């Protein structure tokens, strides 16, 4: 009998999240425990999600029952940069549902988070996974686990046929597919197959629970929210990116050294990414805009600073599939180290299934707006157009 891809309970443990949520949470605990934030859900492809509201609410309510286990805490304790006070905090942490607000606004599903950053930070990934899986249960209930494996093996066979053994030995891929996965079981099957049969170098997964289950490295450093929040955490707006990077350096002392570049655009980021940061951080992550043009800018920036690009790593994570990743790998091989985080194309690529394009983004910090401009116009998210205009002015970003 074919095995279903759905489980009755969507999020079953606290570690079923992206690793960078925990790394940022620890930094928030140590540096901004009293910061207040607001988040807002958006479905970018305007799909009507109202019919699923009751089931989404039910699954959110079940998050309140989730708590970390002793074995999970022991796994985190083995990570050198996870501090004892943060581990103790996690042992006491529970999802507090008073910070989550769901309903219908302007004819669309609305989800908002409002509360202490420290206590709402872990909601983002489970909420997105819940919305995605609930919707998929209704629309694609006939999908079975075998289809997931068949589709993935087609990609692995293609890669084996296209790339030489020398290329495959250097071709690094990680699973970044938690938030928009078809279902939890789908992601688990993908990670299981990649660990066993990926022809290149499968370097890990962003999902902490699956990293623990499959003895993989949990992958991730910071997300946009880290840089966005600093727009309202005290420093002058023009200094906010450097303040975010500096706080990260002080927190992790050389660990977790991949910086995200597109909160306000790559050009604005590089203006702030001086010799100090370029030496301290191991590399950069691309998440919007033309990836090759972005990479060439990064390489040129390192060279201008007198840094050998081959001592640094570029991580690509924007809408990748195997052909795009291989194309980038070949274009940049010998110029700089590269690694690829593939998400939706691994965990929600099933024939006949349309993946969701959903986000849950921070919109305010300490009662004031924050924004992401990015290197792709469609990824800008902020209700306050005046603040976006001011942000563009401060960082010299054309409208």
UniProtKB/Swiss-Prot annotation:
* SUPFAM superfamilies from the UniProt entry: Nicotinate/Quinolinate PRTase C-terminal domain-like, Nicotinate/Quinolinate PRTase N-terminal domain-like
One Gene Ontology molecular-function label: nicotinate phosphoribosyltransferase activity
Q: Does the keyword Membrane apply?
A: no
- The EC number(s) given in the record are 6.3.4.21
One GO BP on record is: NAD biosynthetic process via the salvage pathway
Q: Any idea which residues bear Phosphohistidine here?
A: 224
Q: Which GO terms describe its cellular component?
A: cytosol
Domain of life where this protein originates: Bacteria
Entry-linked InterPro entries: N/Namide_PRibTrfase, NAPRTase_N, Nic_PRibTrfase, Nic_PRibTrfase-Fam, Nicotinate_pribotase-like_C
Q: Is-annotated flag, keyword Nucleotidyltransferase?
A: no
- Give the catalytic activity: nicotinate + 5-phospho-alpha-D-ribose 1-diphosphate + ATP + H2O = nicotinate beta-D-ribonucleotide + ADP + phosphate + diphosphate
Name the pathway: Cofactor biosynthesis; NAD(+) biosynthesis; nicotinate D-ribonucleotide from nicotinate: step 1/1
Q: Which UniProt keywords apply?
A: Ligase, Phosphoprotein, Pyridine nucleotide biosynthesis
Family the entry assigns: Belongs to the NAPRTase family.
Function according to Swiss-Prot or TrEMBL: Catalyzes the synthesis of beta-nicotinate D-ribonucleotide from nicotinate and 5-phospho-D-ribose 1-phosphate at the expense of ATP.
Q: Could you identify this protein by its name?
A: Nicotinate phosphoribosyltransferase 1
Organism whose genome encodes this protein: Pseudomonas aeruginosa (strain ATCC 15692 / DSM 22644 / CIP 104116 / JCM 14847 / LMG 12228 / 1C / PRS 101 / PAO1)
């Amino acid at each position: 009998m074919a095995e279903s891809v759905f489980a009755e309970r969507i999020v079953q443990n606290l570690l079923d999240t992206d690793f960078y949520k925990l790394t940022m949470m620890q930094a928030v605990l140590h540096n901004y425990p009293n910061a207040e934030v607001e988040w807002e859900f958006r479905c970018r492809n305007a799909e009507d999600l109202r019919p699923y509201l009751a089931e989404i609410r039910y699954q959110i309510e079940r998050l309140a029952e989730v708590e970390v286990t002793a074995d999970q805490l022991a796994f985190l304790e083995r990570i050198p940069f996870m501090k004892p006070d943060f581990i103790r905090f996690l042992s006491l942490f529970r999802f507090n549902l008073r910070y989550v607000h769901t309903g219908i606004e302007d004819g669309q599903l609305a989800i908002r988070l409002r509360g202490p950053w420290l206590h709402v930070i872990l909601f983002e990934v489970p909420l997105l996974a819940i919305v995605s899986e609930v919707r998929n249960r209704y629309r694609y209930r006939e999908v079975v686990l075998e289809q997931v494996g068949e589709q993935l093996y087609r990609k692995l066979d293609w890669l084996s046929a296209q790339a030489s053994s020398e290329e495959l030995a250097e071709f690094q891929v990680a699973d970044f597919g938690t938030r928009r996965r078809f279902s939890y079981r789908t992601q688990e099957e993908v990670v299981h197959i990649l660990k066993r049969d990926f022809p290149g170098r499968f370097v890990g997964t962003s999902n902490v629970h699956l990293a623990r289950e499959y003895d993989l490295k949990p992958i991730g450093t910071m997300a946009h929210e880290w840089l966005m929040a600093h727009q309202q955490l005290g420093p002058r707006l023009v200094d906010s990116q450097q303040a975010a990077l500096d706080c990260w350096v002080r927190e992790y002392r050389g660990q977790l050294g991949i910086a995200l570049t597109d909160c306000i655009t790559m050009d604005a980021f590089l203006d702030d990414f001086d010799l100090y940061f370029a030496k301290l951080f191991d590399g950069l992550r691309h998440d919007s805009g033309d990836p090759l043009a972005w990479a060439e800018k990064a390489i040129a920036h390192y060279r201008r600073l007198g840094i050998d690009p081959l001592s640094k790593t570029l991580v690509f994570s924007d809408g990748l599939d195997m052909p795009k990743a291989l194309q980038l790998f070949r274009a940049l091989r010998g110029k700089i180290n590269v690694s690829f985080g593939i998400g939706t194309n691994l965990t929600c690529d099933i024939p006949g299934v349309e993946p969701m394009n959903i986000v849950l983004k921070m919109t305010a910090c300490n009662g004031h707006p924050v924004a992401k401009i990015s290197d792709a116009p469609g990824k800008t998210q902020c209700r306050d157009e005046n603040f976006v205009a001011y942000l563009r002015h401060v960082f010299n970003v054309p409208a």
